[in-house]
Amino acid sequence: MPKTRLDLLLVERGLAESRAKAQALVMAGQVRVDGQVELKASAAVSPDARLDLETGPRFVSRGGEKLEAALEAFGVNVAGRVCADVGASTGGFTDCLLQRGAARVYAMDVGKGLLHWKLHTDPRVVVMEETNARYVEKLPEAVELVTIDASFISLKILLLVVKNWLRPSPPSPLPKLGEGGGGRGVGGEVIALIKPQFEAGRKESARNKGVIRDPGVHKAVLTDVLTFAQSEGFAVRGLIRSPLLGPKGNVEFLAWLKFREKTNGEIETLVGKVLPENM
């Protein structure tokens, strides 16, 4: 694959507003390429290279940090892939996907005017404002990865819809549950936030002003959602606790699902590893 200049790639990824600003960032030592500081703006780098900026917040919202943690933990590479982001809001997940080289992102949210301007004007972003994902039967093209950060709706409802957007996974060896193995060409995947406050029953959600602290409820919610995902054709490949708490201090989790791929069904093992008392 042909390499490209670092300053041009920074602009293309949306990490710098102009080539001049990209060059300034590089000369200031604020750009890392695959973890290493690069001081030449003209350096030839791979289009799939990981680029990191060490100045200010990395993403337009804290959601980007949550998704980054999941991508790192699961070993999922999004470079060159077509993605959809459900519940985009300000665009933290979308921003993270673009910074990691996504070719295109369908940014979907029921609200309007929420998406950060730099994402709203990025040609790689298809803005889908005032759009309720549960009623979107299909997208203009099949996507390889769907990220979900939705509130006031069960993830189970959304999984029933987004599986119709995904490109089917080709046959592949079955990796050990919880290990990496994601990457280009692996087919349809989902990385979704599981929010117990929107999955538990009304009685549980009403306690403590909507903050669920009971590990027993966390376990029940995770087991229920992941078992449902399996029943709908998703293999559960990984599960982590979000590095950041949700609104009001709720514990949240990130699940990695692959569509139409065999699973060895060790949900109980994964759930046990992320429960708060085991952290």
Label every model-predicted segment.
Residues 167-188:
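Intrinsic disorder/low-complexity segments
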Residues 1-49, 82-83:
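A basic, amphipathic helix-loop patch mediating RNA/tRNA/ribosome contacts
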Residues 196-213:
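Short, glycine-/aromatic-enriched active-site segment of Class I SAM-dependent methyltransferases
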